[in-house]
Amino acid sequence: MAPRSSAVHVAVYSGVEVYECFIKGVSVMRRRRDSWLNATQILKVADFDKPQRTRVLERQVQIGAHEKVQGGYGKYQGTWVPFQRGVDLATKYKVDGIMSPILSLDIDEGKAIAPKKKQTKQKKPSVRGRRGRKPSSLSSSTLHSVNEKQPNSSISPTIESSMNKVNLPGAEEQVSATPLPASPNALLSPNDNTIKPVEELGMLEAPLDKYEESLLDFFLHPEEGRIPSFLYSPPPDFQVNSVIDDDGHTSLHWACSMGHIEMIKLLLRANADIGVCNRLSQTPLMRSVIFTNNYDCQTFGQVLELLQSTIYAVDTNGQSIFHHIVQSTSTPSKVAAAKYYLDCILEKLISIQPFENVVRLVNLQDSNGDTSLLIAARNGAMDCVNSLLSYNANPSIPNRQRRTASEYLLEADKKPHSLLQSNSNASHSAFSFSGISPAIISPSCSSHAFVKAIPSISSKFSQLAEEYESQLREKEEDLIRANRLKQDTLNEISRTYQELTFLQKNNPTYSQSMENLIREAQETYQQLSKRLLIWLEARQIFDLERSLKPHTSLSISFPSDFLKKEDGLSLNNDFKKPACNNVTNSDEYEQLINKLTSLQASRKKDTLYIRKLYEELGIDDTVNSYRRLIAMSCGINPEDLSLEILDAVEEALTREK
């Protein structure tokens, strides 16, 4: 396609006469009445993308005399500055030479320039409000093949400048598909200093309606206004899927390219079609990875979550979203963004698709036979190459020129680093490896070994992925069981709490009653514990006296109120010293007294221990059942069962054995 002529002509836009010429595919204007220049167009000629243009305009241009034009005819929009400020801006960014036809134009001579003659052409039907085409998509069962059909379009040698056709800012910033050198009908990128023909672009012939114009104003100057209010409550006549520029983009394409999450959600709420395509069959998700806005704002994860069902779409050149990502790596400053987009999509795919389906999409070839790995290797984007290889990307798939990713990787090893740096600005050159650091470039022998080892590495990765998925499923099942048990426990706690709340509500004195009952139980426990100690002491005294009576005249007496004591026996006061007439030696008597005292201390210690055992044992229904059984066997009431009877029963049972 022939490039546009740089000859200056006169045109009228929005009722304003301008001198116009086309430089690098950009319409550059100079107003006739005051010679003011469009600073936005100058920055486009200097190859600034939209975020960069916005920053330069805010920080350098709009601080001085300027006029901001919004609405009206698309090409006339932008920030206009006095002639000398425009010349200074062009000189600063080294485009004054290429812009000399418009900058050096003598106004007196310019008056003799005739308006550009419009070509007589049959009017095309209006495409405003049309829906974009649905994208070609790849299901998991059809990822083995590649759509190699090339677009069949006629190339027009000239472009008419019409008042009724919109050429909006930003349309030329699109990153095109990989050029097909063998195809004369391939669409060329604006980076090739050409523009798309009218027949291919299908420029809008009807003026934008109020909704579309409001949306375009927001997209072109988002820093200057809020989101259009009608999006929060879309009116019935608002067509959310209508085309709003001459590349066939809808509002959703623009919002996704900008990474504006709130705008995307509002458009989706208004029933925007996530699968709508522009004239190259590019979906909004594809457009979102062409620019770095989603990387700068770290919003791509949210965009991907909203548009994930279109990941498998391909455009008219058979390119998947992976192709579009790695295409941008021809610009070194976009490699980090491309790596970010790749990782996000690969992680999402591996979570929703079998591994083999992910591999098929990664190895998909476009209409030129290029895989995403081949393009990344050709551009020298080693970070992207490593990411793709980790998902079994095949470096041995040839394109139509019989070139493979392996060859580009080997060439990258052989190419000197200085040569790589000199090629850093190459666009789609097969020898462009910009951005590779010396540490990445390994010796040729190691590269050969690496390429040969790739199939083995891929197999190991597949086995590892299968084992990981198996273990992950087991852990997920364990987690489900644990969560179910946790939920049951929480439900039981909730029911218990509800019952407790109900009891407290129906019985206001419930808490006080419980405290009283607990206190009474503790007092009863203390009393029973003391009585048990007294009972044990009495039992031991009784047994001791009975065992000593046949052998000695020693008599042990204890106070008559002994059983009424609360603390049981003491060691020194409760017993009277025994009268022993058989002991004549006072020393022996004292020894016996000391021994007896020691035995009493030991006895009391053992008694306390026995009481503790009784307290821990308690009396349950089984013990009571035994008491009733023994009482019935002896023909007495359970209440009359005494220690003497129990001892007699025990002695009788022992003799029988």
From Swiss-Prot:
Biased segments, Low complexity type: 136-145, 176-191
GO cellular component, one term: cytosol
Conditions for induction: During conjugation and nitrogen starvation.
Domain of life: Eukaryota
InterPro entries referenced in this protein's UniProt entry, alphabetically: Ankyrin_rpt, Ankyrin_rpt-contain_sf, HTH_APSES_sf, KilA/APSES_HTH, SWI6-like, Tscrpt_reg_HTH_APSES-type
ANK repeat feature ranges: 247-276, 368-397
GO biological process: meiotic cell cycle; negative regulation of transcription by RNA polymerase II; positive regulation of transcription by RNA polymerase II; regulation of meiotic cell cycle; regulation of transcription by RNA polymerase II
DNA-binding region: 39-60
HTH APSES-type domain mapped to chain residues: 8-115
Compositional bias annotation for Polar residues: 148-165
UniProt-recorded Gene Ontology molecular function terms: DNA-binding transcription activator activity, RNA polymerase II-specific; DNA-binding transcription repressor activity, RNA polymerase II-specific; RNA polymerase II cis-regulatory region sequence-specific DNA binding
Cystine pairings recorded for this chain: none
Region entry Disordered, spans: 113-192
Keywords linked to the UniProt accession: ANK repeat, Cell cycle, DNA-binding, Meiosis, Repeat
Signal peptide (residue range): none
Short name of one Pfam family: Ank_2
Ranges annotated as biased composition (Basic residues): 114-134
Record's function text: Required for the initiation of mitotic and premeiotic DNA synthesis. Has an additional role in meiotic division.
Quaternary context: Interacts with cdc10 and cdk9.
Identification of the protein by name: Cell division cycle-related protein res2/pct1
Organism of derivation: Schizosaccharomyces pombe (strain 972 / ATCC 24843)
Gene responsible for this protein: res2
